[in-house]
């Protein structure tokens, strides 16, 4: 009996001694595609960033693609459906609505008539203006040459302003091999291994976390309590995407999930969820 009480005391003291998370790890919300704005998603726009920042979000995921002239811009995909979703049927010629754009045409095409497109230069300008904001990259590409090109563009643009900006850039990688490709360009302090393209088994992912120290993000469908707990035991913070429902956030949080990619839930909203652990 005395031994059991002593063990409980040790556990309790251990919990009290845990340092609160700081920096990137202190935030639980990742604003998906710069966050939703006025009910719209996937805008990756300047106005979405500002609106979600004002609502308390500090971590912003941006979709980043190369233009035909090799500039890095914030767009989810080069498809007709995306052009329709972004309300660009009138600002883009029909032949351009489902193809990769030139940089100038992309930047000169308003989103939903009123929102401003972003490129990596303007995103880094925002990070300078908002010095507690973090960027999570969703660069899509997996071929080593394209990955290298994308991350060189990111690092070179940051270094022209202030190399310290790179401390607030969090790359997403899509395979275990991609970590080495990114590290050859720049060693970022935080890396997220996103599993939505991965064919790795749970065991392979857990082993990779132990070897590399990366954190994990995954679709909700893959987030089982057992997998989440094993990842956390291996040392990872665990994120799930893309979640906009309070009940689902509460359920996943109780499983041990640390953070949530979301369109419409802010850090302020999260703090009001009474059932959240």
What residue ranges belong to the model's regions?
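Phosphate-group recognition and catalysis centered on beta-loop-alpha active-site segments
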Residues: 3-277
